[in-house]
Amino acid sequence: MPFSTTEISTAGKASLDHYLKNNPIDQVALDRVWLRQLMKRKKPVPGGKQYVTAQVRYKYQNNGQWFYGNEQVTYNNRESLEQAQYPWRSMHDGYAISEDRLAQNGIIMTDGPGRNASKAEVLQLTNLLDEQNEILRLGTEEFMNEQCLLDGTQDTDAPVGLDGLVSLSPSSGTVGGLAASNAWWQNHAATGLTTTTTTGTILDKMEIAWRACVRNGGRPDFIMCGSDFLDGYRNFMLKSFGTLNHQGGSEISIEGGTKMVAFHGVPVMWNPSFSDLDTTYSPATAWEKRCYFINARHVWMAPLQGQDMVTRKPPRVYDRYVNYFGLTWRGAVVMDRRNAHAVISIS
């Protein structure tokens, strides 16, 4: 017994709504390290023109002065803010199910009134939609995670991501509409760190990057890196400073593996996506060799209100026997303090 066209369309939309309600897009898989961090701090904003804005305090203009008795003092007019503007962008992902594919799964669809589907057809349709909805969610996560890492030049309609916000060339170009030549609008960057046992510069450069972040915006609370950097840092620390204490005559247990790598008490997170970015884009400084120090208070995801992963049900077009289901998102990645972050890389 067949489903009607309307029943298929409504069932697909309802199942997608239900799936995302119980598996929201912000419960991102652990391997999407950067997207997961951004989603934890997301701040919906009202839509307006083409930009999401952030207030940037770039100076205090202090007017402190000493005086005695009836000496005259002065007052000043303070203008301490600039506005960073990030163009919001629109993302789409979706899937199509043709009548032929439904038929291959034992599901018949007609233009009739419907309401006559068998239990077997209902079960088959449910299984098919569950699979499609799951891979739609996972695919959207994969896409958003990658795009939010890149600098925005990969597509004219892409938002600026981490590579543009925390840049290896921090004084070049503009970020958020503000000139990166301003010293107060530059992240810390260092390349060519070495990991040779006892003589490597990696620990010194990490300390310098840490102090630069603390000086300008507070203690970094999120650190992520690629495989090469993680291995280099871990091996440098173990081979340069590692010891094994053993009392003679007693038995010991030796177990391999690294439970956690940290710096100043902050876990150093491995980002598996860095390898994919190297394969796809082959940047001059490999992602696998990079490490980012991030102050999460100063960078976040900013979806437009009412536009954060909206399920869509476009109508079936007259010359295609196909049903369409999709997701859309509109927003930007926003940063209000560049000098609170750092990027470093090994040679």
Regions found by a protein language model. Name each.
Residues 1-289, 294-347:
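Flexible, glycine/threonine- and acidic-rich loop/arm segments that mediate assembly and lattice contacts
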